[in-house]
Structure formats: C-alpha cells, structure tokens
From Swiss-Prot:
Signal peptide (from-to): none
Chain sites annotated for binding ATP: 123-183, 205
Alphabetical list of Gene3D superfamilies matching this protein: 3.40.50.20, ATP-grasp fold, A domain, ATP-grasp fold, B domain
EC number: 6.3.4.23
Gene symbol of the encoding locus: purP
InterPro entries: ATP_grasp_subdomain_1 (IPR013815), IMP_biosynth_PurP (IPR023656), IMP_biosynth_PurP_C (IPR009720), IMP_biosynth_PurP_N (IPR010672), PreATP-grasp_dom_sf (IPR016185)
GO MF entry, a single one: ATP binding
Positions contributing to 5-amino-1-(5-phospho-beta-D-ribosyl)imidazole-4-carboxamide binding: 9, 72, 229
Protein's name in the database: 5-formaminoimidazole-4-carboxamide-1-(beta)-D-ribofuranosyl 5'-monophosphate synthetase
Pathway entry: Purine metabolism; IMP biosynthesis via de novo pathway; 5-formamido-1-(5-phospho-D-ribosyl)imidazole-4-carboxamide from 5-amino-1-(5-phospho-D-ribosyl)imidazole-4-carboxamide (formate route): step 1/1
Amino acid sequence: MLLLTLASHSSLQILHGAKREGFETGIVVNGKREGFYRRFSFIDNFYVYSSEDEAVEKINGTSNSVFVPHGSLIEYIGMERVSRIRTPIFGNRNLFPWESNQSKKMKLLELSNIKTPMKFENPEDVDRMVIVKLPGAKGGRGYFIGRNKQEVKEGIRRLQEKGLINNVEELIIQEYVIGIPMYFQFFYSPMLQRVEMTGIDIRYETNVDGLRRLPSDIKAEPTFVVAGNIPAVARESILPSVYEYAENFVKTTKNVVPPGAIGPFCLESIVTDTLDVVVFEFSGRIVAGTNLYVDGSPYSWLYWDEPMSVGRRIGREINLAIQKNRLNEVTT
C-alpha cells in the first residue's frame, strides 16, 4: 500500500514514519520544491504539480493508497479542492469544515466541557486585553493584541486595508489569558480504543519571542508568526486534567462530527499560574510541533517502548487496521 501526503508542514516526518512501518511512500510536491524533497531516500514516488487543481488530480490518480492530511492542507489547496479528493484520507475529513471555521472550533471545545477563554463577538464588547486571530492555519500571521476596544477596532481596520479579511465575522476575538503556552499532542486510536499523548510543544513565534531581548525602553508591537517549535514536558499533576479534556473531545466529535476524531489532534493551551489549563484552539490533524519527535517523545515511549513519531504512529494505526480488515474505520 502507498501512503502519500502533500509536501509541506510535517510531510517528511509522516513519510519517514510510513517507511519505518513498511509502506511505499509518495509525496505530492510543487515543482519549485521538488529538488529539496529529492534529498530524502525514504520517499519512493514523486507526484509533481504546478497548480492546486493538478495536485488533486495527482492524489486521485494513485491506487491502493491512503492520503495523510496535515495542518497545511486546507491553507495551501483550499477546502473546495480538498472536497474533490477521492482517495481515502486517514482521519475524519468531516472535521475539515469545522477546523476552517473559528466559531465551530470553539463550539466543539465548549461542548467537550473544556475550559476556554472568554470570546467576544463584537469589538464594541471588548472590556479586557484580547488577542485577535485570523481564520485558517496561517501560522499566526496577522494576529494582534488589543488592550481595549479602540485598539481592537484599529487593528481590524489595518487587516481590512491589507486585504487579509473581508468582514469582522471572519475573526475570533478572545480574552488574552496570562500564562505559558503548551500545545498538547494526542492520538486517538480506533484500533486500540484509547487516547495516547504523543508529545508537548511550544511554538517559537516571531517577533513576540524576540522582544524579550530588547531593552525595555524600545517599544515594538508583538507579532505571532510561527517560525519553529520547542519541546516541552508538563508537570505530571497537570496531565490527568489534560487527558480528560482529550477524551471528552473525542467523545464530542463522535456525536457531533461522526465518525469523530481519528488519529492525531492537538489541544492548544495556556497554563496559568494556578496550573489551570485553558484551551484556546484545537488542530484536528497532525501539528508541526510533532516534528520535534522523529524518534519519539518522552510520552510516546511510555506506550510503545520504541521510537514512535506521530508519522510512524499513523502508519502503525493503518497497519493495525489492515491486519484486522478494518481500514474503513480509520479512513474517510
């Protein structure tokens, strides 16, 4: 069987893991990036495209294959084109529209009894410091902090002038929770009927993470463009509540977006000084922070006692499904 993915985000990890699990591998790659990916011997097949429509054709042109989505898929290819993919997709493709809509994303978290930041529908209602986010997986680009409603309205006006948004309804305006970011990575296994923690990361963002190096008298507006990731482990006392969140999330998605979460997902959180975990967003697919753990994380070793990246864990789940003749339970 062929496992393939789009060249970006976590594609190297996905295909490296697939090869470790004995699969033939394939990458759908823009011709401008082909040379880079040719450097890696674990990629068996190259499906080179020059347009997004051609990328979908390349995916659909494969046989006996499973396509593995990642966090850049919708952003690069677009929801309408992704809906035309006929090749089986690992995970729940019905979650894609929910991930692309910030209001729906927050609704799933709230239905899961997960603690979330206060949300403001209208800039006029802002009465505290907030962070304003653009829709979709833009890697933090365009996000800004507003200390009051005047700053929020001014920031929105700048986004409109730059053509980044058409109307305010596209944005999510959230209370800015004071604490440290921790991104809790999970994997739900339909084959083993369990939620596994696969790692934790912190996003390394420019320029907010560089401002601390400046003298205090130099003022600069923070931006939140993700440039990399840093590994983390959490105090063990935090983990039970985070696991409860993850299990609640899986149960909710089964009811609201059947067949529910399958495979990797991430609860993107702030941990406060009282050790409360506040989840401000989720990712329903593999996140780039898993690239830190190509040989496994401190948590994946506790389950498998062998090197187990999330890419390899995806391959392992597909292998288990094939062995049990239940591939339809991990693909949609």
